[in-house]
Curated annotation (Swiss-Prot):
Belongs to the ABC transporter superfamily. ABCB family. Multidrug resistance exporter (TC 3.A.1.201) subfamily. Disruption phenotype: Mice show severe necrotic damage of hepatocytes, strong portal inflammation, proliferation and destruction of the canalicular and small bile ductular tracts. Display almost complete reduction of biliary phospholipid secretion, although bile salt secretion is normal. Show also reduced cholesterol secretion. Knockout mice lacking both ABCB4 and ATP8B1 show lower hepatic damage compared with the single ABCB4 knockout mice. Display equivalent reduction of biliary phosphatidylcholine (PC) secretion as the single ABCB4 knockout mice. This is Phosphatidylcholine translocator ABCB4. It comes from Mus musculus. The gene is Abcb4. Pfam families: ABC_membrane (PF00664), ABC_tran (PF00005).
Length: 1276
């Protein structure tokens, strides 16, 4: 009887899962060989208890799996009894009452069978519970061990390993990969054994009860298997193609979102949208082809299934009529084999999960087994009692493991006596920081040795060595806990008094006492709640509580403004007393009083001595000091280059900061914390996105209504096939009462043909159902994606500044949201229609044939349905709850891994490990509770079927004996309703996750409906006929929305008349680039106004306004297309003719270079223009700006990134471009702006000085000192 459960649930579950996983993955795995670990290795962390759990779980799974085939034996015997006795009940009701005898016998027989069913049900109840809960328990225990071991292994790796691995990847491994293992070693293994047991038991029962029929049915199975395999192959080929097309669309979107400022400034939104839609169209076409081919094969599969029913019934009936089998036997064989065959489908997702787990475990176990050369957990090595602090580097060579071919140190020799302060100076990238890292033994030198007190540091115990060293680095990392805890990381057993003493020494006591929570103030993620100077002082206190013998200060004050610098510097001078100190500084004024100053160049020390000695030598140090003569205001070129816009500067005032990231791969751990915030963001989003009704989503698909009509009709037909099957089945059983054999054979032939007919019908209905909904779904996905992309391009800059809308997050949203919504509309609707039709027609037919039994069964259906739904919910909910629970642990892990350098230099690995382990108890306790709950719901949903069989047939026999129903009607009612219910229970399992889809839809609609503050698509506002080009800023006040508390412009007023050139100068972060962004109307000022030709910018149409401006920025972004297309991007309002492109190129001095390229103007420039040099990119950007014939030209440090040679060429091009246009120039190289009509010096967001070059020099103010500093630079 359970055939249908099998057909409806499992068969379809089989399609569902194939589609989702197994085959498409196999297809992909062939392409890239995935490393898997051995089957048993996966369980290498199981102890005897786990093994016992797994052993008992497997035994019970096998027992549980054998239940259904055994039930079929009972069913067969019962059918025989019914059929034999039916002859006695063909008389009218009143007779049967008088002939009590056979009725009494039948009822007794039925009662006995009811007990058998109940017995089996009881067995299944226990077995299913043990199977699921024991496997889940064992998995939970092992996963906890794996997480601990894995985190421990990560913490003990050496730095070089992290440089190569990248920290973000490790975080995903710790969360996603471990949960893949957990998926693969838990209840899925039990399910697998259960399915395999069902398979074998089914076939064994089949062979014992009737081998002939078994062989005939088996002959058909290969064809069915083959059709499934072909189907899966087709699917995976199309899926790969579709993914490739979507990936291309994704790349376009990512490129546009990554360069959003350029796109908006040049009005390129529609161009990007068209490029995106072109790729989406391709994907859609492939998707539709996929829907056609996949559904043809699905139709064929159903045709084959029905054909096999027809053959089996026809052959079976022949055997029954020739008295070889009884009808019961034939039934037993038929259903046992079917159940057995379909159980294979159920094993597929389990095998898939297991393969995923083996793949994930390969990487994880590999890391666990990796033994680092520098092991901070090791107890080996010398642990000296007291350290004097004499350091010596002798002939040290070194290159970073991640870039082994670039040598950083090339034979470094340096001696530091105990208690001395040595300062290291030199250009960026010369090896200063590397020296500090080698001393902490974060790396080992490739040649040479480093010794402390004459002992090679490799002989020290690693932990001991690091405990005697205190480090304060340029970007101190604080952990998101309280101030006191942060200081305690310096030394675990430190008392509150010691903390206060250290804080006083670090000049931090006063500001801490002013905070409301004092020492218990939380510092936020990476110390975000504190200013740079405050963080720095806490880091110094943290280094001091260690009471280190050796203090390493790596640009400890570079991130500070003058005021905090003085305080921190005083703290450092106090801290240095009596300790051996190595200082790295770019501000040379801070190291004048060092005992020894060592000048680095190119990985070796070229000079050392005191300040006065080195000044006499006139070497490197002398040159560096001269550049900085003005002292107060460093304009050292080398940093300014790296600062692409002042936003970066605003985040961290340091000039050197960006430079360091580029220079030093070792700073990788500064990788943006945003990536790890993505998960949290999704939660933030969930909280504030209003939910969306299902109908609203459907409305988007309303143009495709004909597809929906056809699809729904077919789905209803598919649903009705099942009750039709029940009718034919009951009719066939009824044939085999006493009677004429020839008539029987004739009827059987007829019914077999009807089965075949149903098969042909199902081919068409399944194909049409799948195809129509599939096509409508593809159209919807394409539509949603392009609407979403369009809506994103429409947003204002402040929206893009929000970390929740980083390029990565937006690209992911574009890719996943639309697909998830499709999952919940197309196929889901089809399934709902199909299952409702199934249960609906089933109930109607049942009421017609036997309302009493139908009522009894309907009272049971809710239980079966609810149990099915609960089980599916449990399955889905598991992962979600675990994720929540794991977040606390994940936070600790993420923090430790991202800031691994800090953790290691503070020797706090053990502390983090114990915090992590403590946080794992929650998820583990959860998994125990979950194991039991899940076990109970699963066992109830599995056993209920057996109990309902018992009740149904016992009551059925009563109805038959009393003449209320015929036997065939009992079978009909029973199969129609039970199968309908089973289908309903399963519907929830293969319908894609509805909740996810709702969330995605909600997110998409909130995006579609968001009204940007400055709408780039808007047609409102004035479109003046002519524009002279004068620009005025009137008392403008502005802060960036993402950092509302950091003032940028504080009442800025300036004016530039038409045709004039205005130059803006000032230190980084003073608001120069902000002026350009306000003019482009990326943002609106908070107070004051920006006027163009006397009209307020807000009143002008945005598109018109931007069309008047041409912008060339310091780091111009080019798109991955040809040179001609990049230049033409300057004017997206029309198709730019080729001769104009050439003219612009000539004006920008780039034409001769383009002519030398083989493909000339059709040369592709590569991603972000990587195929070109800086100067070439810069000149193409100038040509791009000139194409639009702008009235106002904005040059934001357009030459700063260039070497002298290219600078000259580009500068000429710019001078040519400025003719007859209003021009606003931002420059750090003052020589380039001497001939500007007006020079404005900005400081702290206000105008401090203005005038021509000569006037300003005469004032001897800020501009004067800046020119002087740079005059020194020229002799470099």
């Amino acid at each position: 009887m359970d055939l249908e459960a099998a057909r409806n649930g499992t068969a379809r579950r089989l399609d569902g899962d194939f589609e989702l996983g197994s085959i498409s993955n196999q297809g992909r795995e062939k392409k890239k060989k995935v490393n898997l670990i051995g089957l048993l290795t996966l369980f290498r962390y199981s102890d005897w208890q786990d093994k016992l759990f797994m052993f008992l779980g497997t035994l019970m799974a096998i027992a549980h799996g054998s239940g259904l085939p055994l039930m079929m034996i009972v069913f067969g015997e019962m059918t025989d009894k019914f059929v034999d006795n039916t002859g006695n009940f063909s008389l009218p009701v009143n007779f049967s009452l008088s002939m009590l005898n056979p009725g009494r016998i039948l009822e007794e027989e039925m009662t006995r069978y009811a007990y058998y069913y109940s017995g089996l049900g009881g067995g299944v109840l226990v077995a299913a519970y043990i199977q699921v809960s024991f496997w889940t328990l064992a998995a939970g225990r092992q996963i906890k061990k794996i997480r601990q071991k894995f985190f421990h292994a990560i913490l003990r790796q050496e730095m070089g390993w992290f440089d190569i691995k990248g920290t973000t990847e490790l975080n995903t491994r710790l969360t996603d990969d471990v949960s893949k293992i957990s998926e693969g070693i838990g209840d899925k293994v039990g399910m697998f054994f259960q399915a395999i047991a069902t398979f074998f038991a089914g076939f064994i029962v089949g062979f014992i009860r009737g081998w002939k029929l078994t062989l005939v049915i088996m002959a058909i199975s290969p064809i069915l298997g083959l059709s499934t395999a072909v189907w899966a192959k087709i699917l995976s080929t199309f899926s790969d193609k579709e993914l490739a097309a979507y990936a291309k669309a994704g790349a376009v979107a990512e490129e546009a979102l990554g360069a959003i400022r350029t796109v908006i400034a040049f009005g390129g939104q529609n161009k990007e949208l068209e490029r995106y839609q072109k790729h989406l169209e391709n994907a859609k076409k492939i998707g539709i082809k996929k829907a056609i081919s996949a559904n043809i094969s699905m139709g064929i599969a159903f045709l084959l299934i029905y054909a096999s029913y027809a053959l089996a019934f026809w052959y079976g009936s022949t055997l029954v009529i020739s008295k070889e089998y009884t009808i019961g036997n034939a039934m037993t064989v038929f259903f046992s084999i079917l159940i057995g065959a379909f159980s294979v489908g159920q094993a597929a997702p389990c095998i898939d999960a297991f393969a995923n787990a083996r793949g994930a475990a390969y990487v994880i176990f590999d890391i666990i087994d990796n033994n680092p050369k520098i092991d901070s957990f090791s107890e080996r090595g010398h642990k000296p009692d007291n350290i004097k602090g004499n350091l010596e580097f002798s002939d040290v060579h070194f290159s970073y493991p991640s870039r082994a071919n670039i040598k950083i140190l090339k034979g470094l020799n340096l001696k530091v006596k105990s208690g001395q302060t040595v300062a290291l100076v030199g250009n960026s990238g010369c090896g200063k920081s590397t020296t500090v890292q080698l001393l902490q033994r974060l790396y080992d030198p490739t040649e040479g040795k480093i010794s402390i007190d004459g002992q090679d540091i490799r002989n020290f115990n690693v932990r001991c060595l690091r405990e005697i060293i205190g480090v304060v680095s340029q970007e101190p990392v604080l952990f998101s806990t309280t101030i006191a805890e942060n200081i305690r990381y310096g030394r675990g057993n430190v008392t509150m008094d010691e903390i206060e003493k250290a804080v006083k020494e670090a000049n931090a006591y006063d500001f801490i006492m002013k905070l409301p929570q004092k020492f218990d103030t939380l510092v936020g993620d990476r110390g975000a709640q504190l200013s740079g100077g405050q963080k720095q002082r806490i880091a110094i206190a943290r280094a001091l509580v260690r009471n280190p013998k050796i203090l390493l200060l790596d640009e400890a004050t570079s991130a500070l403004d003058t005021e905090s610098e003085a305080e921190v510097q005083a703290a450092l001078d106090k801290a240095r007393e009596g300790r051996t100190t190595i200082v790295i500084a770019h501000r040379l004024s801070t190291i004048r009083n060092a005992d020894v100053i060592a000048g680095f160049e190119d990985g070796v020390i070229v000079e050392q001595g005191s300040h006065s000695e080195l000044m006499k030598k006139e070497g490197i140090y002398f040159r560096l000091v001269n550049m900085q003569t003005a002292g107060s205001q460093i304009l050292s070129e080398e940093f300014e280059v790296e600062l692409s816009d002042e936003k970066a500067a605003g985040d961290v005032a340091p000039n050197g900061w960006k430079a360091r990231i580029f220079r030093n791969s070792t700073k990788k751990s500064l990788k943006s914390p945003h990536q790890n915030r993505l998960d949290e963001e999704t939660n933030e989003l969930d909280a504030n996105v209003p939910p969306v009704s299902f109908l609203k989503v459907l409305k988007l698909n309303k143009t495709e209504w004909p597809y929906f009509v056809v699809g729904t009709v077919c789905a209803i037909a598919n649903g009705a096939l099942q009750p039709a099957f029940s009718i034919i089945l009951s009719e066939m059983i009824a044939i085999f009462g006493p009677g004429d054999d020839a008539v029987k054979q004739q009827k059987c032939n007829m019914f077999s043909l009807v089965f075949l007919g149903l098969g042909v019908l199902s081919f068409f209905t399944f194909f049409l159902q799948g195809f129509t909904f599939g096509k409508a779904g593809e159209i919807l996905t394409t539509r949603l994606r392009s609407m979403a992309f369009k809506a994103m391009l429409r947003q204002d800059m402040s929206w893009f500044d929000d970390h929740k809308n980083s390029t990565g997050a937006l690209s992911t949203r574009l890719a996943t949201d639309a697909a998830q919504v499709q999952g919940a509309t197309g196929t889901r609707l089809a399934l709902i229609a199909q299952n409702t039709a199934n249960l609906g027609t089933g109930i109607i037919i049942s009421f017609i044939y036997g309302w009493q039994l139908t009522l009894l069964l309907l009272s049971v259906v809710p239980f079966i349905a609810v149990a099915g739904i609960v089980e599916m919910k449990m399955l889905a909910g598991n992962a979600k709850r675990d994720k929540k629970e794991m977040e606390a642990a994940g936070k600790i892990a993420t923090e430790a891994i991202e800031n691994i350098r800090t953790v290691v230099s503070l020797t706090q690995e053990r502390k983090f490990e114990s915090m992590y382990v403590e946080k794992l108890h929650g998820p583990y306790r959860n998994s125990v509770r979950k194991a039991h709950i899940y076990g109970i719901t699963f066992s109830i949903s599995q056993a209920f079927m057996y109990f309902s069989y018992a009740g149904c047939f016992r009551f059925g026999s009563y109805l038959i004996v009393n003449g209320h129903m015929r036997f065939k009607d009992v079978i009909l009612v029973f199969s129609a309703i039970v199968l309908g219910a089973v289908a309903l229970g399963h519907a929830s399992s293969f319908a894609p996750d509805y909740a996810k889809a709702k969330l995605s839809a909600a997110y998409l609609f909130s995006l579609f409906e968001r009204q940007p503050l400055i709408d780039s698509y808007s047609g409102e506002g004035l479109w003046p006929d002519k524009f002279e080009g004068s620009v005025t800023f009137n008392e403008v006040v502005f802060n960036y929305p993402t950092r509302a508390n950091v003032p940028v412009l504080q009442g800025l007023s300036l004016e530039v008349k038409k045709g004039q050139t205005l130059a803006l100068v000032g230190s980084s972060g003073c608001g120069k680039s902000t002026v350009v962004q306000l003019l482009e109307r990326f943002y609106d000022p908070m107070a004051g106004s920006v006027l163009l030709d006397g009209q307020e910018a807000k009143k002008l149409n945005v598109q018109w306004l931007r069309a008047q401006l041409g912008i060339v920025s310091q780091e111009p972004i080019l798109f991955d297309c040809s040179i001609a297309e990049n230049i033409a991007y300057g004017d997206n309002s029309r198709v730019v003719p080729h001769d104009e492109i050439v003219r612009a190129a000539k004006e920008a001095n780039i034409h001769p270079f383009i002519e030398t390229l083989p493909q000339k103007y059709n040369t592709r420039v590569g991603d972000k223009g990587t195929q070109l040099s800086g100067g070439q990119k810069q000149r193409i950007a100038i040509a791009r700006a000139l194409i639009r014939q702008p009235r106002v030209l904005l040059l934001d440090e357009a030459t700063s990134a260039l070497d002298t040679e290219s600078e000259k060429v580009v500068q000429e091009a710019l001078d040519k471009a400025r003719e007859g246009r209003t021009c606003i120039v931002i420059a750090h190289r003052l020589s380039t702006i001497q001939n500007a009509d007006l020079i404005v010096v900005i400081e702290n967001g206000k105008v401090k000085e203005h005038g021509t070059h000569q006037q300003l020099l005469a004032q001897k103010g800020i501009y004067f000192s800046m020119v002087n500093i740079q005059a020194g630079t020229q002799n470099l």
